[in-house]
Design a protein with these regions (language model features):
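Conserved, well-ordered alpha-helix/loop/beta-strand core segments that scaffold catalytic motifs
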Residues: 188-228, 232-235
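Hydrophobic alpha-helical transmembrane signal-anchor segments
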Residues: 1-20
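Beta-lactam-recognizing serine transpeptidase/beta-lactamase-like catalytic domain environment
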Residues: 51, 183-197, 234-287, 291-373
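Second-shell loop/turn segments in exported
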Residues: 29-30, 57-66, 73-77, 100-108, ...
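Short, basic/aromatic recognition patches
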Residues: 22-35, 213-223
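Extracytoplasmic
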Residues: 35-38, 45, 54-56, 101, ...
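Juxtamembrane extramembrane loops of integral membrane proteins
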Residues: 33-80
Length: 373
């Protein structure tokens, strides 16, 4: 039995695990690389992509491979504007027996030129290595910040608001895994091919009811004003446009958000993070004129030709209510009253229906209900 055990171990060392132990014998080691999965693409109703992904370069550091005596701090400071204090803080705060083998992000979204400069001096920056990762890119000319939402990097990238948050489980992909050979200087020697390689799987796509062309037109109309615009398909209830202003630039949230940019947004008295289309309460105002018109026509209480004389004011007991047009609209029928938003016409019209009927019909139109948007 003893001989059999020895033979089995010998077979394992020399045949089954030869590749792994041969790496270690040659002063090489394996580095585990997590391959971040791209999120699903978000399309508008016409299958135009409005959120996609692009690859960026990130630079990481492994404390175990770092040597402060030979590390070229000046090169890093000149190239990517990361000083010695920042690097040492990351290294020495994670230099425990377990943490020292893990990679820690130094800087993300490095351009190819800077990456090339640093890679030419690998021996002077031992402990640093590059990875690729996907970030969001916004391909549409329209600004859908409040609808789409943005991502946050907590333990992992995930949707923090809007569509990105609501459809997190659909949009997020499945990360991949591979191992790289690393020599005794900590320099990457290429991919180690074995059965543990797992390719990242992209998240599933999401298709919105939003019309990006109509959204852009709404932004043009709104200009610099503060407010919101919602356009819906009256037959299906689909939201074609949802605009809230002021807004914010989503590309600022694709990578690291500069502190100045973040502080400026959260301190803005006009609250650009507030989605005025669905997160604020407003008196319904003239929208009730359309509801009232629909009810009286449906119940055949009046015809569209029913007329009144608008002289600019309406007396109700001891109260006087005014039209927005001080000198009045004159003789108006239903069509003209809607076109001119005549207050006096609808003050008269509301007197023709029962209060209980009004209450029931308004609820039937969905007022007071949670929309699920």
């Amino acid at each position: 039995i003893l001989i059999l055990i020895i033979v089995c171990n010998y077979f394992s060392l020399q045949i089954l695990n030869y590749k792994k132990y041969n790496i270690k014998a040659g002063n090489n080691s394996l580095r585990k690389i997590i391959l971040k999965a791209p999120r699903g693409i978000i399309y508008d109703r016409n299958e135009i992509p409005i959120v996609d992904n692009k690859l960026i370069y990130n630079i990481n550091i492994i404390p175990k491979d770092f040597n402060s005596n030979t590390f070229n701090y000046n090169l890093i400071d000149r190239t990517i504007n990361i000083n010695k204090k920042t690097i040492d803080s990351i290294v020495y705060s994670n230099n425990t027996s377990v943490k020292q083998f893990r990679p820690y992000l130094i800087k993300s979204n490095i351009d190819f030129m800077k990456k090339s400069i640093l890679e030419e001096s690998k021996l002077d920056i031992k402990g640093l290595y590059f990875t690729n990762s996907p970030i969001r890119t916004y391909t549409s000319s329209c600004n859908l910040a409040h609808v789409l939402g943005y991502l946050r990097d907590l333990d992992q990238i995930e949707g923090y608001s809007g569509i990105e948050k609501h459809y997190e489980e659909v949009l997020k992909g499945s990360d991949g895994l591979e191992y790289h050979l690393v020599d005794r200087f900590g320099i990457d020697q290429g991919l180690f091919i074995d059965d543990n390689i797992k390719r990242p799987e992209q998240g599933k796509s999401v298709y919105l009811s939003i019309d990006s062309g109509l959204q852009s037109y709404s932004e043009e109309i709104m200009g610099e004003n503060i407010g919101s615009i919602i356009v819906m398909d009256p037959k299906t209830g689909e939201v074609l446009t949802m605009l809230s202003t002021p807004s914010y630039e989503l590309n600022s949230f694709a990578g690291e958000i500069p502190i100045k940019t973040w502080n400026k947004l959260i301190k803005n008295k006009d609250k650009p993070f507030n989605n005025r289309a669905i997160q604020s309460s407003y008196p319904p105002g003239s929208i009730f004129k359309l509801i009232l018109a629909s009810i009286v026509l449906d119940k055949k209480i009046i015809s569209k030709d029913w007329k009144i004389n608008c002289n600019g004011k309406y007396e109700f007991y001891d109260k006087v209510f005014h039209c927005w047009k001080e000198d009045g609209h004159g003789i108006v029928n239903l069509n003209n009253a809607i076109k001119g938003s005549c207050n006096i016409y609808f003050y008269n019209l509301i007197q023709k229906i029962d209060f209980d009927l009004w209450s029931d019909e308004v609820l039937n139109f969905g007022f007071g209900n949670i929309l699920g948007v």
